[in-house]
Amino acid sequence: MDELLNITEENLRKILTTVRTTGSIDLIYYEPIILCHRIERFMQLNGYASAAMLVEKMMHDKKFADFFLERLRVSTTEMFRDPQMWKELEQNVFDKFRSESVIKIWVPDICGDDELNSLLVLLEKNSLLKKSMVYATCFFNSGLQEAANYEAESKKMEVGIDNYKKAFPDKSNLEDYFNKIDKSYIFSKKLLEQVIFIKHNIFTEAPPDMGFNLILFRNRALNYNLQTRKSCFERLYQSLLPGGFFVIGIGENLHGLDSSVRFMANSKTENIFKKL
């Protein structure tokens, strides 16, 4: 790998080795170029002038190693991102769930989590939430706690409201599912009661359950290396019911998967796939 910013191939190798022995999750599953960018950004924000300083700190402080790992993850940025996808989900997927007695949904590798809360709002709007079992998984306890106590500042809320109105101009207000305290919006605890939060390593552990009707996994795998992406997609495929839906997000694809993995496109523009 050529030198990228301050992170050389040797520096990256030292960081990976240190994280493997002191941290809670292995970085080998991530794309090296993306890792270099994220590490460089972390160093700039936290005042580390060299990789050696970063490695030294991690070697003597396991809590810092986990703090470092958490900060490398890419958080979701807004509710109802890509409004057309949510519209497609309501019109072409949720309608098929109305006859189900129980709807099982998995949102893996949460970080934030705007995706989870957008999903909960849409399920509630369509009177599907009460019969839904929504699994939200993350390797870090802090990520689970953040999602379980979601709040948005005014500017972030404005973006979510705008996205929501683009997708559903005739629906009720997004603010109806938040409590406003000063300048912050606290997400509805009532909706979050339907969520099963589980600490889970998507790279090494079996799915938290099987027989899912829907897996919402938009653009998380863009950060993974090719082999990890392939194995994750195949594992997620196995956990879906036949006829279940897999949402991977714009910019992703299903190329290179095992021939036993068979999907049909439910929406080519929004990358919503149906298991055959």
What is each residue range found by the language model?
Residues D2-W106:
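Conserved AdoMet
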Residues E100-E115, M133-Y135:
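Conserved class I S-adenosyl-L-methionine
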Residues G112-S127:
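Conserved SAM-binding loop of SAM-dependent methyltransferases across substrates and taxa
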Residues S132-G211, L216, R220, Y224, ...:
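Extended basic-aromatic, gly/pro-enriched interface segments that bind polyanionic ligands
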Residues L214, G256-L276:
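Core SAM-dependent methyltransferase catalytic element
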Residues K230-P242:
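A short glycine-rich, Lys/Arg-flanked "PGG" loop and its adjoining helix->strand segment in the class I
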Residues P242-I250:
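Conserved beta-strand signature within the Rossmann-like core of class I S-adenosyl-L-methionine
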